[in-house]
Amino acid sequence: MLQIKIVAVGKIRERFLMEGIKEYAKRLSAYIRLEMTEIADEPCPERLSAADEERVKDREGERLLKGIGPQEHVILLDLQGKEFTSPDFSEYMDELALMGKSSVTFIIGGSLGVSGEVRKRADYRWSFSRLTFPHPLMRLMLLEQIYRAMRISKGEPYHK
């Protein structure tokens, strides 16, 4: 069974998001082993110098990369990444399985983005859209898309 890890900066505080995440985690349990890890975000004041922003991203980046093994396929959620349609994402996940990838890790960075080291470690950079979304909401959206991909892959009905 495919192992999927989601490693994200910050804590989810909104109850409605936590409930949605729990629901999709439950649905996904029939298809994958899911592990979700929250990484503490760096405290930062409103205004930071460019150097301070880089320091924050570097510290968060170190924590993001800490638990990722060398064999894991890493997908970074990134505004500058490439977009998928849902069927294309499902096909991509199927291709990873055919290539023998048994562990896929998705990274969701902090509010300032991610460090260069995290970008370098990514095997694929995926953009959901050119729009910016709240990071806690991205976790729910990601789980929904993974669930949709699994349903598509198995030929099971899923609304379009």
From Swiss-Prot:
It comes from the Bacteria. Its EC number is 2.1.1.177. One of its GO terms (molecular function) is rRNA (pseudouridine-N3-)-methyltransferase activity. It holds the Pfam family SPOUT_MTase. GO terms for cellular component: cytoplasm. S-adenosyl-L-methionine binds at residues 77, 109, 128-133. It is found in: Cytoplasm. Keywords: Cytoplasm, Methyltransferase, rRNA processing, S-adenosyl-L-methionine, Transferase. It catalyses: pseudouridine(1915) in 23S rRNA + S-adenosyl-L-methionine = N(3)-methylpseudouridine(1915) in 23S rRNA + S-adenosyl-L-homocysteine + H(+). Homodimer. Belongs to the RNA methyltransferase RlmH family. PANTHER family: METHYLTRANSFERASE, RIBOSOMAL RNA LARGE SUBUNIT METHYLTRANSFERASE H. Specifically methylates the pseudouridine at position 1915 (m3Psi1915) in 23S rRNA. NCBIfam families: PRK00103.1-3, tRNA_RlmH_YbeA. HAMAP family: 23SrRNA_methyltr_H. This is Ribosomal RNA large subunit methyltransferase H. It comes from Desulfitobacterium hafniense (strain DSM 10664 / DCB-2). The gene is rlmH.
